[in-house]
Amino acid sequence: MSLLTEVETPTRNGWECKYSDSSDPLVIAASIIGILHLILWILDRLFFKCIYRRLKYGLKRGPSTEGVPESMREEYRQEQQSAVDVDDGHFVNIELE
């Protein structure tokens, strides 16, 4: 029998996990944390543009109009639009000599 044949033949215990006691609470906790970390990392990579855009710009929107009567909402929209219209006329042309 050659040495190569003996090396290629695995023993039954060689393929088994050394720490096969899965009832250990530390092993269970580490497995759960590892799986959650992997799931969160995958979601972060898939949706990072949406997530970080919402974090960056989500809080900078105007005040909430929930519970405000429609007439006051329309008045607020008109004020905002008039402020934008006024700002449109304030461009300065600079000519370089």
UniProtKB/Swiss-Prot annotation:
<feature type="modified residue" description="Phosphoserine; by host">
    <location>
        <position position="82"/>
    </location>
</feature>
<keyword id="KW-0375">Hydrogen ion transport</keyword>
<dbReference type="GO" id="GO:0051259">
    <property type="term" value="P:protein complex oligomerization"/>
</dbReference>
<feature type="transmembrane region" description="Helical; Signal-anchor for type III membrane protein">
    <location>
        <begin position="23"/>
        <end position="43"/>
    </location>
</feature>
<dbReference type="GO" id="GO:0055036">
    <property type="term" value="C:virion membrane"/>
</dbReference>
<keyword id="KW-0597">Phosphoprotein</keyword>
<keyword id="KW-1015">Disulfide bond</keyword>
<feature type="region of interest" description="Disordered">
    <location>
        <begin position="60"/>
        <end position="83"/>
    </location>
</feature>
<feature type="lipid moiety-binding region" description="S-palmitoyl cysteine; by host">
    <location>
        <position position="50"/>
    </location>
</feature>
<feature type="modified residue" description="Phosphoserine; by host">
    <location>
        <position position="64"/>
    </location>
</feature>
<keyword id="KW-0813">Transport</keyword>
<keyword id="KW-0449">Lipoprotein</keyword>
<feature type="site" description="Essential for channel activity, possibly by being protonated during channel activation, and by forming the channel gate and the selective filter">
    <location>
        <position position="37"/>
    </location>
</feature>
<keyword id="KW-0812">Transmembrane</keyword>
<keyword id="KW-1182">Viral ion channel</keyword>
<keyword id="KW-0564">Palmitate</keyword>
<keyword id="KW-0472">Membrane</keyword>
<dbReference type="GO" id="GO:0005216">
    <property type="term" value="F:monoatomic ion channel activity"/>
</dbReference>
<keyword id="KW-0406">Ion transport</keyword>
<dbReference type="GO" id="GO:0020002">
    <property type="term" value="C:host cell plasma membrane"/>
</dbReference>
<keyword id="KW-0407">Ion channel</keyword>
<dbReference type="GO" id="GO:0044694">
    <property type="term" value="P:symbiont genome entry into host cell via pore formation in plasma membrane"/>
</dbReference>
<keyword id="KW-0735">Signal-anchor</keyword>
<dbReference type="InterPro" id="IPR002089">
    <property type="entry name" value="Flu_M2"/>
</dbReference>
<dbReference type="GO" id="GO:0015078">
    <property type="term" value="F:proton transmembrane transporter activity"/>
</dbReference>
<keyword id="KW-1083">Inhibition of host autophagy by virus</keyword>
<dbReference type="GO" id="GO:0016020">
    <property type="term" value="C:membrane"/>
</dbReference>
<comment type="similarity">
    <text>Belongs to the influenza viruses matrix protein M2 family.</text>
</comment>
<feature type="site" description="Seems to be involved in pH gating">
    <location>
        <position position="41"/>
    </location>
</feature>
<protein>
    <recommendedName>
        <fullName>Matrix protein 2</fullName>
    </recommendedName>
</protein>
<comment type="subunit">
    <text>Homotetramer; composed of two disulfide-linked dimers held together by non-covalent interactions. May interact with matrix protein 1.</text>
</comment>
<feature type="topological domain" description="Virion surface">
    <location>
        <begin position="1"/>
        <end position="22"/>
    </location>
</feature>
<dbReference type="Pfam" id="PF00599">
    <property type="entry name" value="Flu_M2"/>
</dbReference>
<keyword id="KW-1032">Host cell membrane</keyword>
<keyword id="KW-0946">Virion</keyword>
<keyword id="KW-1133">Transmembrane helix</keyword>
<keyword id="KW-0945">Host-virus interaction</keyword>
<comment type="function">
    <text>Forms a proton-selective ion channel that is necessary for the efficient release of the viral genome during virus entry. After attaching to the cell surface, the virion enters the cell by endocytosis. Acidification of the endosome triggers M2 ion channel activity.</text>
</comment>
<dbReference type="GO" id="GO:0140321">
    <property type="term" value="P:symbiont-mediated suppression of host autophagy"/>
</dbReference>
<keyword id="KW-1043">Host membrane</keyword>
<feature type="topological domain" description="Intravirion">
    <location>
        <begin position="44"/>
        <end position="97"/>
    </location>
</feature>
